[in-house]
Amino acid sequence: MSPISAEINPDAVLQFVDVTVRRGSATLLDRINWTVEEDERWAVLGPNGAGKTTLLQIAAAQLHPSAGEVYVLGERLGRVDVFELRPRIGLASSALSERIPGAEVVRDVVVSAGYSVLGRWREAYGRLDVRRAVGLLDRFGVGQFSERTFGTLSQGEKARVQIARALMTDPELLLLDEPAAGMDLGGREDLLRRLTRFADDPGAPASVLVTHHVEELPPGITHALLLRNGAVVAAGLARDVLADEPLSATFGLRLRVERSSGRWFARAVLD
């Protein structure tokens, strides 16, 4: 099935059907049709103001569209209890990170995801929950910070903790909002290596990764969606979409795109 088809797909992990979002006189998303299926790894790219954050908020069941239909894990937004749906969705974003108390212990930041709260819950956490949380922190290279407070971490370290938290509930859909933002080169490459290894796990969920930069995409991305001014420029297989013409149209600049060892790289074409 085409990822831009408006036909309802009952087996889709995520589907937008003619989705529009308006705020006052501004149109943030304009008639978006998009489908994510099982085992797909999507990248969403576009310049600032393209609508990427709005799209991710809807996918995370945190925002309802002004028009159109959204289906998340087989449930239609507006006809489902989002508080029951959200634990099935893993979300890592800088906006969520800003809401976490700085005094919160890193281990508890991750464990509390299983209780749908941001701070330490009133009950004592189970041993198995704590063990799983520490294991996820280890998996993303921040296990040594499990007893530290969240506010003492760097931006990149917080992003890794956010990913561990997003996976705590064993979600069916994983949403990552610019996970490599603010990282130095070494930190970015290490994170992408870990994300690639995670995506290779047979039990890994379908995922959507939002970024401004093709260089921040890990190998294993299968599909891409390009947004500009709230509208879809292109959507489909990554090898077709992450190419010179679609990316140039998306960013309003002539770009040359190359791929090496499963990674994408883009540079401006100088006249």
Where are these regions (language model features)?
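Helix-to-loop junction immediately C-terminal to a conserved catalytic motif
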Residues: 60
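Conserved ABC transporter NBD signature motif
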Residues: 68-78
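ABC-family P-loop ATPase nucleotide-binding domains
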Residues: 98-152
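Conserved catalytic motifs of ABC-family nucleotide-binding domains
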Residues: 170
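Catalytic Walker B motif of ABC-type/P-loop ATPase nucleotide-binding domains
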Residues: 174-178
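H-loop (His-switch) and adjacent beta-strand-loop-beta switch element
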Residues: 224-237
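ABC ATPase nucleotide-binding domains
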Residues: 249-271
